[in-house]
Structure formats: structure tokens, C-alpha cells
UniProtKB/Swiss-Prot annotation:
Underlying gene: hemA
Protein name (record): Glutamyl-tRNA reductase
Organism of provenance: Methanothrix thermoacetophila (strain DSM 6194 / JCM 14653 / NBRC 101360 / PT)
Binding site for substrate: T48, C49, N50, R51, S100, E105, D106, Q107, Q111
Family: Belongs to the glutamyl-tRNA reductase family.
One Pfam entry name: GlutR_dimer
InterPro entries hit by this protein: 4pyrrol_synth_GluRdtase, 4pyrrol_synth_GluRdtase_dimer, 4pyrrol_synth_GluRdtase_N, GluRdtase_CS, GluRdtase_dimer_dom_sf, GluRdtase_N_sf, NAD(P)-bd_dom_sf, Shikm_DH/Glu-tRNA_Rdtase
Reactions catalysed according to its record: (S)-4-amino-5-oxopentanoate + tRNA(Glu) + NADP(+) = L-glutamyl-tRNA(Glu) + NADPH + H(+)
Subunit composition and interactions: Homodimer.
Amino acid sequence: MSRITSMLVTHKKASISEIENAWHGDVEALLKWVSSHDTVEECAVLKTCNRVEIYVVSPRGEKVLFEIAKKARVSSRIIDIHDHDESLLHLLRLASGLESMIIGEDQILGQMKELYRTAKSLGYTGWVLDTAFKKAIQVGKRVRKETAINERSVSVGSAAVDLAEQILGGLEGKSVLVIGAGETGELISKALVSKNIGSLYVTNRTFGTALSLAASLGGTAVPYEEMKRKIREADVVISATSAPHYILLKDDIERAMEGRKNKLLIIDIANPRDVDEAVREIEGVELHNIDSLKQISDENMRLRMREIERVEAIIEEELELLRAKYKRREAEELLARIYSEAEKIKEQEVRRAMNKLSAYHTLGEIEQKVLMDMSHSIVNKIFAEPTKALKSAAERGNTEMLRYAMELFRLNQEESD
């Protein structure tokens, strides 16, 4: 059984700009590129604002991933390469929210489901990755049901609202413009409404989407072409679009600040970023991006240490079950190869016996069936105890016994041929 190898570029080692630059195309293009490598049997990609993670099932997984990093010009300084067991642990921790910038956030679980569904629907995953991702998603759900890991502001969107509240000393009566009405924009808008703000404005490229979200929350939808004018009236702008380029330049914000006395807070949580960094130079404007949210992450970490211990206990329990499943599969594949070889020998010897008997008299159907049944029974009985022993060895993690079995039946020679 080929195993999982993964390459991670995340907020732990990389800045937001380095994560942005790790891969410029969409997920489908990245999947196609990764799968084009000869030895890649399965692959999946997780790409969010805080991470680009590539999972491959390949006998040469590490080599393939280093080649991909080299071609994409990703510095080895910001890369983590995980082997099979490390990848399984990481996936379970990721789905549980322990690897997120905001510990325990719910958004990552939805993103994992969606990105896994994309890879599976396009035919890039098989049993090995399906098993890992299904278990990770199941564990993510269990953790949120049995612990309080996600009971505070845990999504990036919620953290952006908390940051705004912290900077301004409260959001009561404030006018807030949310740019982007997708999943993150919706999370932001809902979090804002709970803060008793004065006015909520929502804008989106597709006006109908903005209209629907604003109407559901008692806010006002703003046509996208009027967005820059509406900034003049806002105390806070939170941007979370999926645009591949800046949507707000320095000139745009300078015009919005003309004749304005009160300050403007802009929080850009998009990846790639929505707001030009040069906006920081404008007097009266305070710009924050995802990097600023690390403050919120640190605070949540302190408050959730007790829950993290409970989550890790669940992960440890589920990881053992997952590892056992892979070990059983490994033993089953080995046994299938042994039985396949035995079947070939059985058929050869039965044919030889039939040919010898046919020299003396014509064999009837019943006689042929008796010979076939007998040979089948002999094979099964000979391998009954070795089968149990190999399955037991696999579940105990006794890889040496599996290796000896491969050598004994000369199966390792087939792999090297």
C-alpha cells in the first residue's frame, strides 16, 4: 500500500505574502499539476488564507513534493514535509481546529469538506486519502460536539470583528462596511450584528448575493460600483473577497478620506489581499490584515488550554483506530497477493492433474469440480493460520513480520522488477 506524504506551507512558518505566493492558481489547476507526476496515485489540496497543503499518495512522495516546491519556487525554509503517520495526525488536528491561527475555529472544517469534495469529485482521491479525510472530518465534528473548543470567537471572520472592537473600544453605534458576501463575509456580518452596531453595509460583485445577506440581517446592500463612495461613511471596513488582485488602492482610500475628520479602520482578511499595503501611509487610516489576528489567536490559546487537552485525548483515541485501519489494509493487500500467487499455482497443478487423469479416461464435470473444490480447500486451510497471524501482526504494528512474509513469498522481487 502506498502511503501519504504531505507538504505544508502555513502561518506557523510563512507570512501571509509567502502563503499567497506559494501557489497563484486555483485548486483544480494545482490538483491537475500534482497528479500529472508519474508516481502520484492520489492527491488532495487544502488552500485557505492561512495555508497551502498538498497531500500525495506515492511510493516517492517526498521526492515528488520537493520537485513541486522547487518548480513553484517555494523556499524550503517555510515548508514542512510530513510522512504518513505525521500526515494523519496533522489532518485530525487540523479538522479539530488545533492547527488554525484561531484555535478551535469552525471555518476550517467546512473548508476541508469542500476541498476534499473537489478532489474526490474530480477523481484525484482513492481509498488511502478517502479514509484519512473522512476520519478527519468525523473527528472534527466529534470534537466540537464533546468539547467547548469552539465556544468563543473562533473563525477568522469573528476574530476580525473582535479585533475591530478591541481597537475602537467597542462597536456600538459604528457604521461598518463588509466587502464580500461569501461564507466569510456572512460570518463577519453575523458577528457584527451581535455587537449592536449602528449600520451594516454589505457589498459584493453579485448584487443579489449582497442583497440577500443584508436583508437577512437588517443591513443595507450596496452596489459594488458604489463601494468606494460608501467608504466615506464607514467607521470600519472589513474586506473578505476572493478577488485575485487589489480591489482598494491607495488613491481610492485617499479620496474617501478627503474632508473627513474621524479615523478609518480597515481590516483585510482576504488571500490574496484586497487592500494595497500602501494604504498604511494615509493619515487617519489604520490597516490590519491576517497577520494582525495572531493577537486574537494568542488570547484564545490561553483561554482554551483546558479544552485542548480534551481534544488531544479524542485525537489520540481516533488516531489509533485510523492507524489500525491502514495496517489491516496493508495486511489484506499482502494476503491478496499471496493468495493470488497460490491461486496461480493451484490452477497450474489442477490442470496438470486433469491432463494426467485424462490420459486414462475422460473426466466428467463432477470429477473436475471435486478436484477444483479440493485444491481450493487445501489452499484455504494451509493459509488460514498464516492469514490470522499476518492480520494480527499488522494491527500490532509488527512491520517486520509483514516484511518477512513478503521475502518468504518472494513478493518484494515483484516490486523491484
